[in-house]
């Protein structure tokens, strides 16, 4: 997930404003400490000095932007932790979601995903490896079809496959088989897995399946999720699919085991 252009622009503007203010204070102190007031300074001259200084030292702007990014991320993580705690039952133990790995595991890893999300597809091997390597992880899968009707059809097919005991197999093949995930692909994959395709197509219309999608969407909105994938490990959050996703997942699983989590997870 990337910051929206508007947010990035706002951050840069905030950095510049902060630098101008800081530079003004420094100049006042250097010019006449305790005597010269900020209001008596030549504003244009100060702005010009700051502009010239930034032009010669652009790395300062980068450093300030990086620091703002860190603070914003920390604030967002803190807010998300509270939201996770307030919605722990629906996030970790909803009967509408499906669980892979150990259903009685001691740590829950929740993934929000879309079958047409390239980053979700890239993350799949790390998620599968986590479940295979750690027999105590409980993987809660939240279908969040944000890429339109084709994604929604694929999600419904996967949820319908659960009625025939093949949810996780269907889940993996929808990611690994080439081509866009849509209804046609889902039905073909279902046939390859030996499912009753006619029954699956009928089960896709089950109101409980739509309820599952609606619940995941509502939770994503509460969490402020702007894209997929998103991982919750207890009340720890991993947005997107970083290159070291497996390492981050195992680290946070270990943290939850050692320290617990604020949410009832």
Where are these regions (language model features)?
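C-terminal cap of thioredoxin/glutaredoxin-like
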Residues: 2-47, 51, 71, 188-265
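Solvent-exposed, acidic/flexible segments
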Residues: 39, 43, 47, 54, ...
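Extracytoplasmic c-type cytochrome modules immediately beyond a signal peptide or single-pass transmembrane anchor
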Residues: 39-92
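Flexible, active-site-adjacent loop/turn segments at secondary-structure boundaries
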Residues: 52, 58-59, 97-98, 142-145, ...
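Short amphipathic alpha-helical/adjacent loop interface patches that line ligand
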Residues: 58, 124, 217
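A short beta-strand-turn-helix
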Residues: 89-107, 131-132
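Short, flexible turn/loop "capping" segments at secondary-structure junctions
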Residues: 102-103, 150, 230
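Structural alpha/beta surface segment adjacent to cysteine/selenocysteine redox centers
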Residues: 110, 115-116, 121-196, 201, ...
